[in-house]
């Protein structure tokens, strides 16, 4: 069985060495880059399964790397940030990152986040509330659950793995609101003990709306349940 490949991008050599060693021990194939330009070159050559991305780097920072990766790939991205300003982390998420960890961090915590993200992205849908055939038509959307593909007005919409998992959760119980805490647990695998900014959910909802709604500022599909969280509006849908 081929090992999953992880690209670690960080300008601190000590962090690269620690992560290369730890992640290799638990079974990953690890490659690394010291700056953003080198990272993009390695990415195109190696096609990793997941990227661990530091935000503050020379030549091309993490924001620029994230933007470039999202132009061509839906690869899972976990940000590493020493920035205390929440707005900086939110910017990274808005550019397409799937998750973040604040420095200094425990390598075990990062290992857990990597396993959780890869498990969520790689696994086939196992939600019993979704049809076995895997095709759901909702208004102008066609959702292929098994292939993790979404079409809007018959045109393919590219979603990251986490975006699709979030959509999959919402449509599994259309019309029922999900709290942010529930979404964090079901999609990201966070337990109640881990303190995390719930705006991770808000940013991913905004990204989904931007891709799926005709008017993201006035959504018809993914609605805000005031005081609760979010829900997928029940429409005249069909299952194939």
From Swiss-Prot:
Ranges annotated as DNA-binding: 74-92, 133-234
In this protein, which residues make up the domain named Response regulatory?
5-118
- Residues that the record marks as modified (4-aspartylphosphate) are 54
Q: Which InterPro entries match?
A: CheY-like_superfamily, OmpR/PhoB-type_DNA-bd, Sig_transdc_resp-reg_receiver, WalR-like, WH-like_DNA-bd_sf
Among SMART domains, the record links this protein to: REC, Trans_reg_C
What's in the keyword line of the UniProt record? Answer: Chloroplast, DNA-binding, Phosphoprotein, Plastid, Transcription, Transcription regulation, Two-component regulatory system
Q: Say which domain of life the source belongs to.
A: Eukaryota
UniProt keyword Chloroplast present:
yes
Q: Mind listing the GO biological process terms from this record? A: regulation of DNA-templated transcription
Is Membrane found in the keyword set? no
CDD domains from the UniProt entry? REC_OmpR, trans_reg_C
Give compartment(s).
Plastid, Chloroplast
Give one GO molecular function term. phosphorelay response regulator activity
Q: Which Pfam families match?
A: Response_reg (PF00072), Trans_reg_C (PF00486)
Cellular component per GO? chloroplast; cytosol; protein-DNA complex
State the function annotated in the UniProt record. Probable promoter-specific protein mediating the interaction between DNA and RNA polymerase.
What name does the UniProt record give this protein? Answer: Probable transcriptional regulator ycf27
Provenance organism: Porphyridium aerugineum (Red microalga)
